[in-house]
């Protein structure tokens, strides 16, 4: 018999768009020429297709020969991964358990998203993954308004043939100036069950501080009819391995805008943390973290230790060159 949480996964998966094809198709595949095959895996049906790189080669590699305008470019042996917890939400402000309830950002949260965008404005972004919740999507969209490449983030709609057809971009040049955004429920916040909508302070007074602390901070203990951090990690990490890591391996620079618990789960995987270590990990709203994926390994290059870009990120040579080319382009 399915557990209540398993059933909630199925319910969420049935109503939330999965954007079920490789985002790398966005730039070059014509609408009627996308070969697909379907496979069932971990709560979802995923459509896969032949991969086409979306990496921004304008600043990352030399221009192709004028005599060979479609000459393929050598893929980079490293890729940037940016993690951003969404800005403050209206329920963060009210000190309510939010979980999978879909609430927007506060004005402060909007400002945090914009400031996050300023910090990553010199880091290449080819592809964005968000949860299916509006606070994460708002954070991603607002952050990208600050990026120096001025590419436009576009949420992919592939939940139906009509949705895909109606949202198709027919200009190849416009597609080149866009960034695909994939929303996935697997990156949603931990589902807090019967705590969702309750005031955190009042809940502690009702059930006891120790009990609420176990529900919130333990790895294996779920709140009533909700998810434990372990259950959240199972879906978030599986999605990361199946969908995001292959994009990084292809040289695509990825940003993930998600939530405290889904991002803690992913960081546990990236940093090889124990179940005890991850319970003490805190992520600030609207502060981007930077990793470099190179030769199959993740290297942490930034943590929230300063308010300026220089105080947050240790650039690799490749990222430094990217910024230099942005600076040079700005002077033309």
UniProtKB/Swiss-Prot annotation:
Transit peptide: 1-48
Site annotation Transition state stabilizer: residues: 259
Catalytic activity from the UniProt record: (2R)-2-phosphoglycerate = (2R)-3-phosphoglycerate
Entry-linked Gene3D superfamilies: Phosphoglycerate mutase-like
EC number: 5.4.2.11
Pfam family, any one: His_Phos_1
Induction and repression of expression: Highly but transiently induced by nitrite and nitrate.
UniProt main location, coarse: plastid
Keywords attached to this entry: Chloroplast, Gluconeogenesis, Glycolysis, Isomerase, Plastid, Transit peptide
Gene coding for it: gpmA2
Residues of the active site: 86, 189
Top EC category: isomerase
Protein name: 2,3-bisphosphoglycerate-dependent phosphoglycerate mutase 2
Key word Isomerase present: yes
The family this protein is said to belong to: Belongs to the phosphoglycerate mutase family. BPG-dependent PGAM subfamily.
GO cellular component: chloroplast; plastid
A biological-process GO annotation: gluconeogenesis
Entry-linked NCBIfam families: PRK01112.1
Binding residues for substrate: 85-92, 98-99, 135, 189-192, 200, 216-217, 260-261
Domain of life: Eukaryota
A single GO molecular function term of this UniProt record: phosphoglycerate mutase activity
């Amino acid at each position: 018999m399915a557990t209540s949480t398993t059933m909630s996964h199925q319910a969420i998966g049935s109503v939330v768009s999965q954007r079920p094809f490789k985002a790398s198709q966005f730039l070059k595949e014509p609408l009627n020429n996308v070969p697909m095959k379907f496979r069932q895996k971990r709560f979802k049906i995923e459509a896969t297709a032949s991969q086409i790189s979306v990496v921004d080669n304008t600043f990352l590699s030399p221009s192709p020969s004028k005599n060979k305008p479609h000459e393929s470019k050598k893929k980079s042996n490293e890729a940037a991964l940016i993690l951003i917890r969404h800005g403050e939400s209206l329920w963060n402000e009210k000190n309510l358990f939010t979980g999978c309830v879909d609430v927007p950002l506060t004005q402060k949260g909007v400002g945090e998203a914009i400031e996050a965008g300023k910090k990553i404005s010199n880091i290449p972004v080819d592809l964005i993954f968000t949860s299916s919740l509006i606070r994460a999507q708002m954070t991603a969209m607002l952050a990208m308004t600050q990026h120096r490449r001025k590419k436009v983030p576009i949420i992919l709609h592939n939940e139906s043939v009509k949705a895909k057809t109606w949202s198709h971009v027919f200009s190849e040049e416009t597609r080149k100036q866009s960034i695909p955004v994939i929303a996935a429920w697997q990156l949603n916040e931990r589902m807090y069950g019967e705590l969702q909508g309750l005031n955190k302070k009042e809940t502690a007074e009702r059930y006891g501080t120790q009990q609420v602390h176990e529900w919130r901070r333990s790895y294996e203990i779920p709140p009533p009819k909700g998810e434990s951090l372990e259950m959240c990690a199972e879906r978030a990490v599986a999605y990361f391995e199946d969908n995001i890591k292959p994009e990084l391996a292809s040289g695509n620079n990825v940003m993930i805008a998600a939530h405290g618990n889904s991002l803690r789960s992913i960081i546990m995987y990236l940093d090889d943390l124990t179940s005890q270590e991850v319970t003490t990990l805190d992520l600030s709203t609207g502060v981007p973290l930077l990793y470099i994926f190179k030769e199959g390994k993740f290297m942490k290059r930034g943590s929230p230790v300063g308010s300026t870009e220089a105080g947050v990120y240790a650039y690799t040579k490749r990222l430094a060159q990217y910024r230099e080319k942005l600076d040079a382009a700005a002077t033309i």
